[in-house]
Amino acid sequence: MESLLECFAITDGKCHPDCLKANNEQEDYDACQSAALVAVSLISSARVIFKIDSKYTEYSPQYLVDNVGKEEVEGEMDQPSCQYTVGNLLSYLVENVWTKKEVRQREMDQQRREFTVKDCFEFAFKKGLPRNGHWAHVGCIFPVPPFACQIPRVPMKGEVIEAANVSEALKLGMQQPAAARLHLFSPEFDLVGEGIYDGPSGNETRYVGLRDVLMVEAEKIKGETVFTVQICYKKKTSFVKVSTRSMILPLNGDDESQVTEPACLLVDFCIPRFSIN
């Protein structure tokens, strides 16, 4: 296994041309990739804040994409096919890397699962996480090798703490950065720039959906609580100020029959609370 980890270090994030092409064709990260990226960022931050890690350590988001929600196989690590041997490595290359891209992509699409940042936290506390350089990059199109279960993981102990509203989220944010999901409307979000994103503004508004964000700061602007969030949208990371006032959100177009009850643009607040021994 040490030789495999050494290979990861030598390749230093380089990937197969098919991976590069697939990633370039993907306009934005999908929901699972986004959730995993936010989760590992918050885990890394929290572990430094509470002095569990002596320095900021990046953990693998793709490990979460590959494994959260996956059915567990009892005794997997003891199976012959899950041992890191030259024979198993060659079998993997023949069956996966040297097959046609279309076959691989079809298999990946069939195995795709949906999960949230909270699911990622819970999985990390249960199974631990490998360091970022010890697993595939985000968006890797190749199946996980059976022997990848032998890759060492950093154990994590803790629980997920959730906040039901903005007031509770403010308290969470005083201790460490928190995760949330943001209702995205276009073109308002695309045009916000240095201003405050305050949701839909007219009949031309289009609801994009929920996006995972990191809440990094709260402040009062003209008497209103405003959160600064970090978001990766269309694969570009930016910091945006978001209004916390409640409003009517047309989540399915501008048909009044689809308008929901007053809600906040930010929802689903949570943090990973680590146990400190």
Swiss-Prot record:
Keywords: Cytoplasm, Nucleus. The keyword Nucleus applies. GO terms for cellular component: cytoplasm; nucleus. It is found in: Cytoplasm; Nucleus. Signal peptide: none annotated. One of its GO terms (biological process) is response to heat. Expressed ubiquitously, including in seedlings, leaves, stems, inflorescences and siliques. Induction: Target of TAS1 (trans-acting siRNA precursor 1)-derived small interfering RNAs in response to temperature variations, thus reducing both basal and acquired thermotolerance. Repressed by trans-acting small interfering RNA (ta-siRNAs) siR480(+)/siRNA255-mediated transcript cleavage. Highly up-regulated in seedlings exposed to heat shock, with higher levels of isoform 1 than isoform 2. Induced by HSFA1s-mediated (e.g. HSFA1A, HSFA1B, and HSFA1D) promoter activation. Belongs to the heat induced plant HTT protein family. Mediates both basal and acquired thermotolerance via HSFA1s-directed pathways (e.g. HSFA1A, HSFA1B, and HSFA1D). Triggers the expression of HSFA1A and HSFA1B. Interacts with the heat shock proteins HSP70-14 and At2g33735/HSP40, and with NFYC2 in both cytoplasm and nucleus. This is Protein HEAT-INDUCED TAS1 TARGET 1. The gene is HTT1.
